């Protein structure tokens, strides 16, 4: 009897593993859900505003057909403070994984899924968050799509890691993120909130902006709601 139970468990495990492999292969091939083609992965579509300069080189304003004021910042234009804060907060093993942090994912499943701990932290890497920003943010319109969205993000994250360096992924993430208050991208956010360039962000300023990455509305430092401003300060500290 015990042997039959053990054999049945092995069969169930084998079937589950095969099903997982089939799902991920199907996602990678684009048979299930939306998988961006190589051309789109190599050239993601996110528009930047055009900066208008005066004769003496000062920025007078920005212009964009997309109705946002995102202005590009290269990796060299970013303060080490914003890079270190982002990695420490969102993806401490960013330099070690290839898109998926198995350890963080397992921890999140056990603590959140099994132990129901809200403060267990997430399992999403910076690469996964970028995948969501670029390709899957508006896809989950029904239950099936929501169930598939996370595996799709995993596959896209792994592909992004193949096509881009770690520095390029960080740069794309910070340029893409919407920091609210018409501050799309790190350059506009640094100017809007602190009146400086991204390369000049101090530790506490970088911590404040990175704190918004988890939930911009909840950690909005200039919100009219004092509770939200308090949340932003607590998150920063």
Language-model features: locations:
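Peptidoglycan glycan-strand catalytic modules in the bacterial/periplasmic cell-wall system
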Residues: 47-49, 53-237
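N-terminal type II signal-anchor transmembrane helix
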Residues: 1-52, 113
């Amino acid at each position: 009897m015990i042997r039959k139970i053990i054999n049945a468990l092995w069969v169930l495990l084998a079937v589950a593993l095969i099903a997982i492999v089939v799902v991920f292969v199907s996602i990678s091939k684009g048979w299930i859900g939306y998988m961006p083609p190589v051309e789109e992965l190599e050239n993601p579509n996110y528009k930047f505003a055009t900066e208008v300069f005066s004769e003496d080189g000062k920025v007078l304003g920005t212009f964009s057909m997309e109705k946002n004021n995102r202005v590009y910042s290269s990796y060299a234009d970013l303060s080490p403070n914003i890079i270190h804060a982002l990695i420490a907060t969102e993806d401490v093993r960013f330099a070690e994984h290839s898109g998926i942090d198995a350890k963080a994912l397992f921890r999140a499943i056990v603590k959140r899924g099994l132990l129901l701990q809200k403060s267990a932290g997430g399992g999403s890497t910076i690469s996964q968050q970028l995948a969501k920003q670029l390709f899957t943010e508006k896809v989950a319109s029904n239950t099936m799509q929501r169930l598939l969205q996370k595996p799709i993000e995993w596959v896209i994250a792994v592909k992004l890691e193949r096509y881009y360096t770690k520095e390029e992924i960080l740069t794309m993430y910070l340029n893409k993120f919407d920091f609210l208050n018409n501050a799309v991208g790190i350059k506009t956010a640094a100017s809007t909130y602190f009146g400086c360039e991204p390369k000049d962000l101090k530790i506490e300023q970088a911590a404040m902006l990175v704190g918004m990455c988890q939930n911009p509305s909840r950690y909005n430092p200039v919100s009219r709601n004092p509770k939200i401003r308090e949340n932003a300060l607590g998150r920063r500290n």
